[in-house]
């Protein structure tokens, strides 16, 4: 099952939700502002990142700039607590399943969440 972590006002989040719905991909939606991610959720996501916290923290966010925190000097537990308290620190949307992780919306990369049969059929239809 796909988990879509988003905030409703985020344009990229709305695009990701619309894309998943239009391709009839089942997913569970999590509003990170009303239901902040647990530290276990965050740890699970971090295990799938290539660059660790750098991939999930939005350094351009107003919250990040206002807090003026040097995330490189925080322990992982301190960082997880901070993100739990301030979910707007996260880049959004976060889309994950048992194998894949996508942070942000990219129409080409999100195709990884389509079932293989769907992608194969779609590819064959473009050849005909």
Curated annotation (Swiss-Prot):
SS bond list: 10-13
Q: Which PANTHER family match?
A: ARSENATE REDUCTASE (PTHR30041), GLOBAL TRANSCRIPTIONAL REGULATOR SPX (PTHR30041:SF7)
Which Pfam families does this entry report, sorted A to Z?
A: ArsC (PF03960)
Q: What superkingdom heads the lineage? A: Bacteria
Give GO terms for biological process: negative regulation of DNA-templated transcription
Asked if the Swiss-Prot or TrEMBL record annotates the protein with the keyword Transcription regulation, the reply is: yes
Query: What job does this protein perform?
Result: Global transcriptional regulator that plays a key role in stress response and exerts either positive or negative regulation of genes. Acts by interacting with the C-terminal domain of the alpha subunit of the RNA polymerase (RNAP). This interaction can enhance binding of RNAP to the promoter region of target genes and stimulate their transcription, or block interaction of RNAP with activator.
The subunit field of the Swiss-Prot or TrEMBL record says: Interacts with the C-terminal domain of the alpha subunit of the RNAP.
- Which InterPro entries does this one have? Arsenate_reductase-like, Spx, Thioredoxin-like_sf, Tscrpt_reg_Spx/MgsR
Q: Which GO terms describe its cellular component?
A: cytoplasm
* Record bears the keyword DNA-binding: no
User: What protein does this entry describe?
Assistant: Global transcriptional regulator Spx 1
The record's comment on protein family reads: Belongs to the ArsC family. Spx subfamily.
Q: What is the lineage of its organism?
A: Bacteria, Bacillati, Bacillota, Bacilli, Lactobacillales
Localization per record: Cytoplasm
What keyword terms does UniProt attach to this protein? Cytoplasm, Disulfide bond, Redox-active center, Transcription, Transcription regulation
């Amino acid at each position: 099952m796909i988990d879509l972590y988003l905030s409703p006002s985020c344009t990229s989040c709305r695009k990701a939700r619309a894309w998943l719905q239009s391709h009839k991909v089942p997913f569970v939606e999590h509003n990170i502002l009303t239901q902040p991610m647990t530290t276990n959720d965050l740890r699970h996501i971090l295990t799938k990142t290539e660059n660790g916290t750098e991939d999930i923290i939005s350094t351009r966010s107003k919250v990040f700039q206002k807090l003026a925190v040097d995330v490189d000097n925080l322990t992982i537990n301190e960082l997880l607590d901070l993100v739990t308290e301030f979910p707007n620190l996260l880049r959004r949307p976060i889309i994950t399943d048992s194998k894949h992780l996508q942070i942000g919306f990219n129409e080409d990369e999100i195709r990884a969440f389509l079932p293989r049969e769907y992608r194969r059929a779609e590819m064959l239809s473009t050849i005909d």
